Amino acid sequence: MRRKGFYALNVQACCDRNKRFLWCYPSNNGSTYDSAAFGNARLYDLLKEMAIELQEKGLFIVGDSAYGLAPFLMVPYDKDEMKNDTGHNMDSFNYHLSSCRIYIECAFGELIMRWGIFWRTLLFDLRKCSKIIQVAMLLHNFIIDCREGRVDRGDDSYFQDFEIETDDMQDELTMATGEAPRALATDNNEPRRRGRPTIDEETQRQLGDDIRHRLTIKLAAHEMKRPLQHDMHYNKQGHIYMTS
């Protein structure tokens, strides 16, 4: 149950620059913090295991301040970190990071506006709500790919390529029979199986901070600052002009 008193799902997802959903994890309850929900996902474990390889290739995903900094996950500088940002380099990094992250915001916005079922409360149990979200994302991708001419509309194998993450140990969302829905299961509440040893959280943050610092310096070296904010005015002829 969410803090506002109704049942909901926390849906984690990744997309590309075309706003196609690449990965979806709709198996946490609505009151779960985003960082905790992402930490419950198998994708998070996989990224931790591949941290060194991803770092060598300069690859990472982008998130907002709700997530924890990691070498595979870049997040913006917070207000405390920016207190000594005299050159506005951290602010410039935040601006460009936000410019990348906006694609997922737009993807969710288009998903909601495209399918009228999301314009109101979903009057289904949480298990069915999860399936509805997954199918809507698949159709959303299909429309984008058809629009860009990247898919044969008669190809039935198209929908087999989308990664939908559910629980390994318990494939469906658990609900108590005859009772109000309880917290959604995460791998049946058992420790997740892991592969190679992974770095601890503090080391992970330090490595992430090092990568973020190097990116910040690189942006500053190329003078990629946040664009100046301009004020818009009208002259007597009604023409618009800008002042900084």
Locations of regions flagged by a protein language model:
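Short, well-ordered secondary-structure "scaffold" segments embedded in the functional core
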Residues: M1-S244
